[in-house]
Amino acid sequence: MANNKSAKKRILITKRNNLQNRFYKSSVRTLTKRFLSDLETYKISQSNTDKDKLQNGLSSIYSLIDKGYKKNVYHKNTAARKKSKLAALLKAA
């Protein structure tokens, strides 16, 4: 266990950051899975409502990825790669 004040503080900060990192990564994974299932539905139906749903889903994923990058959960290139892959999937649909 930590013996001095700064080490104890670092333990608390590490726990806080770990929770924050898990929240962002889990949320991005969940929204991505939802986006991919909506994408499959759109490929079958080709309706405008599904297209709007995809656009909204993509923007919310982008927002979370950008916030995660801003809080050092994701590296800049990792965030860009995730966003680029999702955009390419939507464009191909």
Curated annotation (Swiss-Prot):
GO biological process: translation
GO cellular component, one term: chloroplast
Places the protein is found: Plastid, Chloroplast
Listed InterPro entries: Ribosomal_bS20, Ribosomal_bS20_sf
Keyword entries, A-Z: Chloroplast, Plastid, Ribonucleoprotein, Ribosomal protein, RNA-binding, rRNA-binding
Gene3D superfamilies on file: Ribosomal protein S20
GO molecular function, one term: small ribosomal subunit rRNA binding
Top-level taxon of the source organism: Eukaryota
Keyword Chloroplast found: yes
Family to which this protein belongs: Belongs to the bacterial ribosomal protein bS20 family.
PANTHER family: 30S RIBOSOMAL PROTEIN S20, SMALL RIBOSOMAL SUBUNIT PROTEIN BS20C
Known function: Binds directly to 16S ribosomal RNA.
Protein name as it appears in the record: Small ribosomal subunit protein bS20c
